Every structure is written in structure tokens, then in C-alpha cells.
From Swiss-Prot:
Part of ribonuclease P, a protein complex that generates mature tRNA molecules by cleaving their 5'-ends. It comes from Methanosphaerula palustris (strain ATCC BAA-1556 / DSM 19958 / E1-9c). This is Ribonuclease P protein component 4. GO terms for molecular function: ribonuclease P activity; zinc ion binding. The gene is rnp4. Keywords: Cytoplasm, Endonuclease, Hydrolase, Metal-binding, Nuclease, tRNA processing, Zinc. It is found in: Cytoplasm. Zn(2+) binds at residues 63, 66, 89, 92.
Amino acid sequence: MTVKSQNRQTKKLAGERIAILFTQAKVFAGINPAWSDRCVERARAIAMRQRMRMEREQRRQYCHHCYAYFLHGVNVRVRVHRGHVIVTCLNCGRQTRYQVVRTDNR
């Protein structure tokens, strides 16, 4: 097996593992939030080790300051203001802003 194919295979495996960790974080969120936060930390570590980006949906499911898994209505507040979505982590108070992109589906 060549180095290039090994690299592709490990990145694919890492992506699958990250997806599994985020599903586990969702399950653990109601049971023990510390476990779900740990799953997020492990997923980030895998992504950094493999030098790959997480998907947009995965990146928006946790706080980038305290790495807490977001449970809407419990530890996160979401507001829409002037074309931006403002996500506030209620654990650390950090605000993250995402631009709202309007699609042309009129």
C-alpha cells in the first residue's frame, strides 16, 4: 500500500470516528454533559492530528472556547440579528457569530 492511499484511508477512518464521537456526544448530553464534552475534545484531537477539517454541522455543535457540546435551550442561546446568527455559550459566555447566507429560492 502506498503512502498516499494509506493517508486517504486514515483520513476516511478519522472522519468516521469523528462522526461516531459526535453521535455519542448527542446521546451522552442528557445523561452526563461532561461525557459529551469529552467526546467533543476527542473529536477535535483526532481532526487536528490528521490535519483535517470537521464538517460545518459538527463545528457548530460545540463552543470553540470551552469545548462544551451545545444543547439548545440548556447551555446555548441562539439569536438572529441583522443577518447574523449569534450563538452564546451559557457555560463560558463566549459569543460566536455566523453570517446568514440567503439562498435565491423565491
